[in-house]
Amino acid sequence: MDTKEEKKERKQSYFARLKKKKQAKQNAETASAVATRTHTGKEDNNTVVLEPDKCNIAVEEEYMTDEKKKRKSNQLKEIRRTELKRYYSIDDNQNKTHDKKEKKMVVQKPHGTMEYTAGNQDTLNSIALKFNITPNKLVELNKLFTHTIVPGQVLFVPDANSPSSTLRLSSSSPGATVSPSSSDAEYDKLPDADLARKALKPIERVLSSTSEEDEPGVVKFLKMNCRYFTDGKGVVGGVMIVTPNNIMFDPHKSDPLVIENGCEEYGLICPMEEVVSIALYNDISHMKIKDALPSDLPQDLCPLYRPGEWEDLASEKDINPFSKFKSINKEKRQQNGEKIMTSDSRPIVPLEKSTGHTPTKPSGSSVSEKLKKLDSSRETSHGSPTVTKLSKEPSDTSSAFESTAKENFLGEDDDFVDLEELSSQTGGGMHKKDTLKECLSLDPEERKKAESQINNSAVEMQVQSALAFLGTENDVELKGALDLETCEKQDIMPEVDKQSGSPESRVENTLNIHEDLDKVKLIEYYLTKNKEGPQVSENLQKTELSDGKSIEPGGIDITLSSSLSQAGDPITEGNKEPDKTWVKKGEPLPVKLNSSTEANVIKEALDSSLESTLDNSCQGAQMDNKSEVQLWLLKRIQVPIEDILPSKEEKSKTPPMFLCIKVGKPMRKSFATHTAAMVQQYGKRRKQPEYWFAVPRERVDHLYTFFVQWSPDVYGKDAKEQGFVVVEKEELNMIDNFFSEPTTKSWEIITVEEAKRRKSTCSYYEDEDEEVLPVLRPHSALLENMHIEQLARRLPARVQGYPWRLAYSTLEHGTSLKTLYRKSASLDSPVLLVIKDMDNQIFGAYATHPFKFSDHYYGTGETFLYTFSPHFKVFKWSGENSYFINGDISSLELGGGGGRFGLWLDADLYHGRSNSCSTFNNDILSKKEDFIVQDLEVWAFD
């Protein structure tokens, strides 16, 4: 027994050992926590805890070695964060809640919003309508990933009581995370704020409304003004909206044709799935002409539009041409950025940047130094490049010049830029201008000494620049180099720029830029100048210059643009005449003068130097343009001054391009009723499925980009590439040169009669005996074989071949409309109504649905009326409306519109009426409008 007890004491059980290990582990954890809290790093505390239990010393020592390593690594981190914990660790509970919050995305309510809980019946559209906001805005406001919401979901909606009327989706928008820690100001108090942000800021998902993900990467719809070429009903202006799913056209309600015929005739909508081909052309040579053979088509058809220099690729290669299109657009942008470059690749400084520098009075320099500068400028005018540094100091002269430059160049930057270096050709002229400015800004006594040399230098430079261009072969450049003042004294205009169009367009540009100026005075100046001669212009200029006022309202200021560049930049003006809008690069730029002395010095020098030399060259070739402008001004002066401003139509001189949309079936009328929109595909079968629109040329690239992005397989595809030939008419058409193309068509669609004719090569007539009449069960009391045969031919294909079963007959079931409804309730197929009146006339209708009681019209476009009085006629759906079938307790109606019914029967199936209705455009089916029913049958197909 003793041995057994000793064994028990010596050998402990498994659970006892496990319990001791667990207890030792807990003691080690508490010891490490105490060591971390005190930061002493001593081991005595841990050993004291472990002394009572001597059996577990080895196990605890293993734990302690691991804890020492962990403690050393943690102490380094804790020492770094000791300073930070003063600001963040308030208590343990708050830290625990912070740890939980770090795992969640904290959403702050935006300004001007309130919370709304979605109900069972709420949808995103209904909530948006309730709070006067668009659904897309609501999705953006709540950062939703779908338009689907669930009951109980909390959404942010605009608050009507909030003072902020607009919702600002900024950094405080929903989705922007808010850190649960302290503010940024507390971060700045720390010795290392960046370290604090990196160390303690939780890892969170930041959703900002200004991020690139929120911005739409592609255009989701296009909206533009265009004109629709209708089929024989004129051309209507309207708005086209193109989306990835639909193409819509809404006519302008103010269009004369819309006022006359209504908007129902011109509103169109077409799903993108029904579009066969979309193409853009420069003309309408591809437009189909009615009753024209293929050989009559023009041979020089306009090629398909491609942006830039894109070659007309094959259809299988241009499925996704994004890369090349982007590269072409990039080249276009580079070309637009280099429009200030001339044909000979010499840079031209824009006017504002060159004239915006203010001439100042140089301090510390004498008159001799300025005259030396002027002499050196004459020496370097034709040769080496010069470096000029223009001053920015203000002066009285510069203030007036700045205002003129800013008004003439409204679209450019107003900042003044120092011109550090220019090219060789441009630098000479610029240096001469700067030197001339410095000389003119001298004191009066200094100016008198320099006037003679200024006159000589100006005359010499003007004569040299003008005579240098006399030898050129280009007349346009020659006339651009001529002096403007001399041409004005001779009452002559320079050559019209090729890029500016007609003289009318240049005058329109003048009036457009100077909208804030006195336009009446401008036009009076033009007219009086042409009548009284050049002396008027001299007097006007002298008075304006002597007064020191701004000379723009009078139209006297000579404002210059870049030059005769091939880039076609818009020309700024303000000259005495509308065509004087540019000079050659070699000429000195104009200077705004404030005194009559300065004006006379320059003016007399220019006039005397070039008046005799350039008289004939300016006068000969420009009289036509002057007379055109005179006539145009005389016509425009008769209208109010508001009408002188150019309209949008006048500004856009480029012709439109033409958009051709080919569809598989005619487009639906967007303003038609819902039922008509569903069944409109059955009507107007003879209408060609091709629609033409005139679109603005500036929106053509947008259209092309949109189609290539959303429907790349549609643009430019021809219908024949798909292997189908759209048959638009029911009868056969003669196809010119059908057999000239060997084996290009694998199959064709023909009528039943043509197939029968081809069965026998020697048959020249149709064998009508081969037609098998449908089986009628039971035999009809009203229809004979002749009636059945003719009706069977006109029935839709989906019911041909089925036996006819009698569903209702007045001879069997009695004369009651309710009985007819009851017998037709079990049917699930189209029905044929046959009526025989007291005049023994047989007529009726084919209905796509069984007759039933309904509170609205039903049926499809396959419904038709027929009569055998006196000959067999079928009246199909006209497409005007969708009043096919309407079943009521008191009557049964087929066709309607305008209070007239194609066929009407009373509740007793005894009295009836037939009128011409707009649904079928039918004749009266019976001999008289009102008739009495003798017998009636309803046949089903099953």
Curated annotation (Swiss-Prot):
Transmembrane segments: none annotated. Residues 1-46, 161-188, 324-416 are annotated as: Disordered. GO terms for molecular function: nuclear receptor binding; transcription coactivator activity. SMART domains: LysM (SM00257), TLDc (SM00584). Highly expressed in brain. Weakly expressed in mammary gland, ovary, uterus, prostate, stomach, bladder, spinal cord and pancreas. Expressed in cancer cell line. One of its GO terms (cellular component) is nucleus. CDD domains: LysM. Residues 25-38, 356-368 have a biased composition (Polar residues). Residues 1-12, 369-381 have a biased composition (Basic and acidic residues). It is found in: Nucleus. It holds the Pfam family LysM. The modification Phosphoserine is found at S89, S179, S183, S208, S209, S211, S441, S500, S502. Residues 781-942 form the TLDc domain. Residues 114-157 form the LysM domain. Belongs to the OXR1 family. This is Nuclear receptor coactivator 7. The lineage of its organism: Eukaryota, Metazoa, Chordata, Craniata, Vertebrata. The gene is NCOA7.
